[in-house]
């Protein structure tokens, strides 16, 4: 019998690049090579998966992409209970999180048309879903299942928070004491980002709110640690500070001075690697970009991503109208008003589509097209 001929790798990639993303998930178990291929950036780009912004208004969701022109598409979403505008919209580990306060949160992968409700066991009007991460399995750098961190005000002392962890696999909740291993108390500032199962925040010192640091939360031992001082030095509490993931394995920080409107982008110099315990190595920062032209906008709760050497920002003007700004070479390259987005002051976040499937427990399909 003649030996079985194998298809060239290039031909396999070409064939798989034509398969709908929702069908690719089933092929992850074919081989380790195929599984790694679906996470390969070049393969993802062949599926036209690029950074975009997701916007949510009172009754609609939109995807805003650059190909290279601005393309706005309304998302047709059929998830019961998500008819109203969410209170929180963040991207985390390739998923989108829509926080509905006391109703819970919807975790979805719009690219794969998958969605899942996480319902809280506590009836609190101001639940805060802080992000999704995972523990590390003993001495192996492997995840042991997704978890989400939630907080809400303590009934006896509203100035303090109660913290709980939801486990995706068991659909169970447990209380956790958020132990601060930092040398002094801090207040978390803005939304978290998730990298390698670890949640990161900008935080301000309780005793001096002009001093900011980066902290991270380790799901393995349920503690908060200081990651580094902010690379941009001392800050005013009116300055814009936004943390993001950079090139999938590093962090980036956007700062806009509230007085001069100058924008700085800082990135970690090297890849951020987790230790076997799930802890994180210290980082060195470098200045990636500075823009100080006179026609810069005042950024209001911006979301952003870095496209090669350009900064792409979504922000609202004084009337609540959404705009996309492209910045590079120390100048404002372009600004585009998103006219087709219905409703002022939309929530928005940057999002990079992924082929990571939502954990199977109680997964629901949603008729959503990106």
Swiss-Prot record:
Protein name: Putative F-box protein At1g47390
SS bonds (residue pairs): none
Entry-linked PROSITE patterns: FBOX (PS50181)
Gene3D superfamilies assigned to the protein according to its UniProt record, in alphabetical order: 1.20.1280.50
Pfam families tied to this protein: F-box (PF00646), FBA_1 (PF07734)
Domain F-box: 1-47
InterPro entries, A to Z: F-box-assoc_dom_typ1, F-box-assoc_interact_dom, F-box-like_dom_sf, F-box_dom, Gal_Oxase/kelch_b-propeller, SCF_F-box_component
SMART domains in alphabetical order: FBOX (SM00256)
